[in-house]
From Swiss-Prot:
Organism: Staphylococcus aureus (strain Newman)
Phenotype when changing residue 173 to A: Loss of interaction with neutrophils
Induction entry: Under the control of the Staphylococcus aureus exotoxin expression (Sae) two component gene regulatory system.
Signal peptide annotation: none
This protein's name: Enterotoxin-like toxin X
Domain notes: The C-terminal domain contains a V-shape binding site for sialyl Lewis X.
Protein origin, superkingdom: Bacteria
Subcellular location: Secreted
Region of interest (Sialic acid-binding motif), ranges: 164-180
Key words of the record: Secreted
Functional description taken from the UniProt entry: Plays a role in the inhibition of the host innate immune system. Inhibits phagocytosis and killing by human neutrophils by interacting with multiple neutrophil surface glycoproteins in a sialic acid-dependent manner.
Length: 203
């Protein structure tokens, strides 16, 4: 269902070009120059390609761990077999609720507002289940793709003003997994996430 977990230089450069992101100057045609100027330009070109520091091994391992966990399309007997965990405009059944995920991804100063929602049965679920389903929906748009940890939070908002915050850079805490939430009481899910430009393939 998902792309193999990988981050190749060609994908990185393609992603940068597709987003129109430029670091340290603008792309253009260099004027004719002597050898010393050409060498200087070559160094600048290499610097432009290195848009961020290479992530350390521990960060890469954590991103992979998060991807491996949240990319699974099943959790406690619930599954995405009917594609209810990704965007849908299908009419709802009487026992279903559609929860809208509203927010932004910020990439190198550019803000994206992807359109998404999830469709759940009206029932009491655990925070572990809800956390998994919501992050699964975000992975379908690129969360945890690449080698850098995202920054920012995902917030589950209830109709009575309650909030449950999910920190995108780490797993849900064990002591919160069994918190019970009625899906019919959820108002929406909001998010404000910042992704590494190196890891963006789709938003």
């Amino acid at each position: 269902m998902f792309k193999k977990y990988d981050s190749k230089n060609s994908i990185v450069l393609k992603s940068i070009l597709s987003l129109g992101i430029i670091y340290g100057g603008t792309f253009g045609i260099y004027p004719k120059a002597d050898a010393s100027t050409q060498n200087s330009s070559s160094v600048q070109d290499k610097q432009l390609q290195k848009v961020e520091e290479v992530p350390n091994n521990s960060e890469k391992a954590l991103v992979k761990k998060l991807y491996d966990r949240y990319s699974k399309d099943t959790i406690n007997g619930k599954s995405n077999k009917s594609r209810n965990w990704v965007y849908s405009e299908r009419p709802l059944n009487e026992n279903q609720v559609r929860i809208h995920l509203e927010g932004t991804y910020t990439v190198a100063g550019r803000v994206y507002t992807p359109k998404r929602n999830i469709t759940l049965n009206k029932e009491v679920v655990t925070l572990k289940e809800l956390d998994h389903i919501i992050r699964f929906a975000h992975i379908s748009y690129g969360l945890y793709m690449g080698e850098h940890l995202p920054k920012g939070n995902i917030v589950i908002n209830t109709k009575d003003g309650g909030k449950y915050t999910l920190e995108s850079h780490k797993e849900l805490q064990k002591d919160r997994e069994n918190v019970k939430i009625n899906t019919a009481d959820i108002k929406n899910v909001t998010f404000k996430l910042v992704k590494s430009v190196n890891d963006i393939e789709q938003v």
